[in-house]
Amino acid sequence: MSVEASILVLVGGFIGGVMRFFLSGYVGRRIGETFPWGTFVVNVSGAFVIGTAAGLGARLGGIFSTTIFHEFIMVGLLGGYTTVSSFCLQSVNLMLDGEQRQALFNIVASALLCVLAVAAGYGGIMWIMEWPG
């Protein structure tokens, strides 16, 4: 990996991490912390955005298929933004707290909705780009 690529990932990861921190905290304060809603929202929205970005790259190419876009947005920004490791830890903590149903819901719903969000983002771009100019 080049120095330039490392810097792109670093800066993107910093921005994505700050975005995750604020959005997750905001959602947690608004909805409550009885369930890890902040992490849930971040994971689903991050999945949607990465699907949208991949769709733009596949449909339009150009800047969306460049190494810079991939390193900064896909690896850095979205890698710093999404919180799969936090999701896993919170699922285990729910189990350890005796909240097996909430843990199972978190695991199943997050996996299902994140996959659907990627497909929706990707499919949405494919559909929008089919519109006559």
UniProtKB/Swiss-Prot annotation:
Cellular component aspect of the GO annotation: plasma membrane
Presence of the UniProt keyword Transmembrane helix in the record: yes
Gene Ontology terms describing biological process: cellular detoxification of fluoride
Localization: Cell inner membrane
Superkingdom, natural source: Bacteria
Membrane-topology descriptor: Multi-pass membrane protein
Function: Fluoride-specific ion channel. Important for reducing fluoride concentration in the cell, thus reducing its toxicity.
UniProt name for this protein: Fluoride-specific ion channel FluC 4
Lineage of source species: Bacteria, Pseudomonadati, Pseudomonadota, Alphaproteobacteria, Hyphomicrobiales
